[in-house]
Amino acid sequence: MGDTVVAPAPLKPASESTPGPPGNNGGSLLSVITEGVGELSVIDPEVAQKACQEVLQKVKLSHGGVASSDRGTPLELVNGDGVDGEIRCLDDPPTGIREEDDETEATVASGTAKGARRRRQNNSAKQSWLLRLFESKLFDISMAISYLYNSKEPGVQAYIGNRLFCFRNEDVDFYLPQLLNMYVHMDEDVGDAIKPYIVHRCRQSVDFSLQCALLLGAYSSDMHISTQRHSRGTKLRRLILSDELKPAHRKRELPSLSPAPDTGLSPSKRTHQRSKSDATASISLSSSLKRTASNPKVESEDEELSSSTESIDNSFSSPVRLAPEREFIKSLMAIGKRLATLPTKEQKTQRLISELSLLNHKLPARVWLPTAGFDHHVVRVPHTQAVVLNSKDKAPYLIYVEVLECENFDTTSVPARIPENRIRSTRSVENLPECGISHEQRAGSFSTVPNYDNDDEAWSVDDIGELQVELPEMHTNSCDNISQFSVDSITSQESKEPVFIAAGDIRRRLSEQLAHTPTAFKRDPEDPSAVALKEPWQEKVRRIREGSPYGHLPNWRLLSVIVKCGDDLRQELLAFQVLKQLQSIWEQERVPLWIKPYKILVISADSGMIEPVVNAVSIHQVKKQSQLSLLDYFLQEHGSYTTEAFLSAQRNFVQSCAGYCLVCYLLQVKDRHNGNILLDAEGHIIHIDFGFILSSSPRNLGFETSAFKLTTEFVDVMGGLDGDMFNYYKMLMLQGLIAARKHMDKVVQIVEIMQQGSQLPCFHGSSTIRNLKERFHMSMTEEQLQLLVEQMVDGSMRSITTKLYDGFQYLTNGIM
């Protein structure tokens, strides 16, 4: 027929008993849908009922009409305004030349009428089931995203868009890349359903606004996007970056970007005037670097950066609340681009230190690290602690950031700058200004922000040497991706409950600790990051806090971040989402696999920030520094085979190795050399750098053919092929794969939605999603899965391509 109605994927034919999420392989949902159906404060039940009616009527006609046609020819609704419309075949010959007799016609007519009544009854039940599913506790954010993506009906899409308001912010935030990618690349009905929620959240949170603006810019940058779709994403981005989405009270408080005299300003206005000064930090910094640059290429890049900055600011007219942060991010990105032009690691390190020392002159400011999970202001960047990371062609670098936590970023005043010399003369807490995290306390302490831009004494050499930068890993002990090492060092408190330990256990543990103190790495000019990364995080925090003028404050936090330029982190963000989903699945199914997803901030199509994994160094650095095998290094770090520390580290190694082997198999992760596999202080391995996943491989050679990387050194740490821990490893692999395939749809939809309109290399080829689904082996029995795991483990352990690739990396990049 003409415009055939395509039913949403979740809806089943009339013969099936339940509506479920698309691709759902589970059992009936009706037994639980009838229980605990909650009322939704945001959803209008009449609107929902009408939307479901529209969808299900069309589904009924589509399914029922085809079923009633014996000849399989297209059907047409003659009276297309309702359920009782006449259905006929488009290809029927004229009445005058029909060969059927009257009796046959009567029989067909009678059957059609009865079929229509049955279909009305069935679809009425379906309609009730679908609405009850939407309103039930089973309807989580994952199911909502699936229906939003698969449904072709504007009514259902609008309903789901309204339903987003009922989910927790953090649950929706996880799927923000999918929502914005659908907005940019799918039809207008989907965009219209999503936009109200995005606008509402942007009014509530400046950090959410920044995340949306960055992602919209990145996802709109693909060359194949049509002019109409590109302009749609750009229009929403401009709206987010404008004053239109500011809450009304903030519009009244925040001044314009034009300079204003200090006289007559209220304390809050003085604070925002300071923020305006901060917003020009990178412009001032760029001009200073031009005057001192000795490299003509660097000078040219600075001019391009300045021109680009002016163009962006003029184009989007950034409000005060986002302008300082955008300039702060641009400054960090510009540093990375300039470092990439220098030939040696030593020159890059020196340049990085000098660049950050200049940046420090604009702090504290109304800026934050977007990778953090709490409100805060950046106060210092310890430039001498920054290091350049290993990279052949680019210059990613790691910085540490000192921040002060606050209750609300928008309403809390920017902290006053505390000069270093004042701290040294009056070190006691009693003589320092109190600076709590409450709004009232902070308003009293920081109501007036002095301008130290021209104060030479305030910015002495000693001051610059102690600075630090913020990060998201140390704040909370919740189940986010923030590093627990940071949490332990900053927020933990000694338990007041008495703990009784046998004296013999105390003596034994003390002797083990004294005999097996973790080793320190030697400084290597070719790899300066090794020493910084090997230092225990708690020691680093203590050392930096003691030397900081802000360290006495109870809301002081230390964070860290990796800044990358020239790399597209959209694939990294996709991998992070899949890892988080698998981590949640294994926790839900109580499978003791261990993986550590780390946060990714996509800034543009070729730049971003990464949350570092603290207390961890690469296996390459371990082997280069220690000149030991992996097993011998474990014995050196954790003690002999029978010690509690070694057994705990060995178990951690097995659980993390099994987890990442499954990740590498499902996502087809490549480029698995020892520089991309970390080993932390507790024995876990952590895979990093997911630049080659799914359909992409280094240089598109497809050289690594094994399911995952499992070397003989890994097996030795597990106790050998006949060891109990090796059998435990294979058992975890099987349990993890069984658990993952139970929730395959949750994993696949993350990847499938991001493929829409994407030019990422991981989506090259038409079979990416089909191959991903096949790796879950839905048709296999558990016995067949066990055999498959045995074959994958054996093949990976004996893979000649893994050994050849490690040798290739050693010869070309020196990676051991």
From Swiss-Prot:
How is it regulated at the activity level? Answer: Inhibited by wortmannin. Increased kinase activity upon interaction with NCS1/FREQ.
Q: Outline the extent of the PIK helical domain.
A: 49-242
- What's one GO MF term for it? 1-phosphatidylinositol 4-kinase activity
Enumerate the UniProt keywords alphabetically: Acetylation, ATP-binding, Endoplasmic reticulum, Golgi apparatus, Kinase, Lipid metabolism, Membrane, Mitochondrion, Mitochondrion outer membrane, Nucleotide-binding, Phosphoprotein, Transferase
Q: What is its EC number?
A: 2.7.1.67
Q: Where is this region: Catalytic loop?
A: 668-676
Membrane-topology descriptor: Peripheral membrane protein
Query: What SUPFAM superfamilies does the entry give?
Result: Protein kinase-like (PK-like) (SSF56112)
What is the catalytic activity of this protein?
A: a 1,2-diacyl-sn-glycero-3-phospho-(1D-myo-inositol) + ATP = a 1,2-diacyl-sn-glycero-3-phospho-(1D-myo-inositol 4-phosphate) + ADP + H(+)
Note the superkingdom of the native organism. Answer: Eukaryota
Region: Activation loop; residue ranges are 687-711
Q: Where is the composition biased (Low complexity)?
A: 278-294
**Keyword Repeat on entry:** no
**Region of interest (Disordered), residue spans:** 1-28, 93-120, 249-318
* Alphabetical GO biological process terms: inner ear development; phosphatidylinositol phosphate biosynthetic process; phosphatidylinositol-mediated signaling
Cofactors, names only: Mg(2+); Mn(2+)
State the family named in the UniProt similarity comment for this chain.
Belongs to the PI3/PI4-kinase family. Type III PI4K subfamily.
Give the record's subunit note: Interacts with ARF1 and ARF3 in the Golgi complex, but not with ARF4, ARF5 or ARF6. Interacts with NCS1/FREQ in a calcium-independent manner. Interacts with CALN1/CABP8 and CALN2/CABP7; in a calcium-dependent manner; this interaction competes with NCS1/FREQ binding. Interacts with ACBD3. Interacts with ARMH3, YWHAB, YWHAE, YWHAG, YWHAH, YWHAQ, YWHAZ and SFN. Interacts with GGA2 (via VHS domain); the interaction is important for PI4KB location at the Golgi apparatus membrane. Interacts with ATG9A.
Described function: Phosphorylates phosphatidylinositol (PI) in the first committed step in the production of the second messenger inositol-1,4,5,-trisphosphate (PIP). May regulate Golgi disintegration/reorganization during mitosis, possibly via its phosphorylation. Involved in Golgi-to-plasma membrane trafficking. May play an important role in the inner ear development.
The entry's protein name is Phosphatidylinositol 4-kinase beta
> What is the scientific name of the source organism?
Rhinolophus ferrumequinum (Greater horseshoe bat)
Q: Which gene encodes it?
A: PI4KB
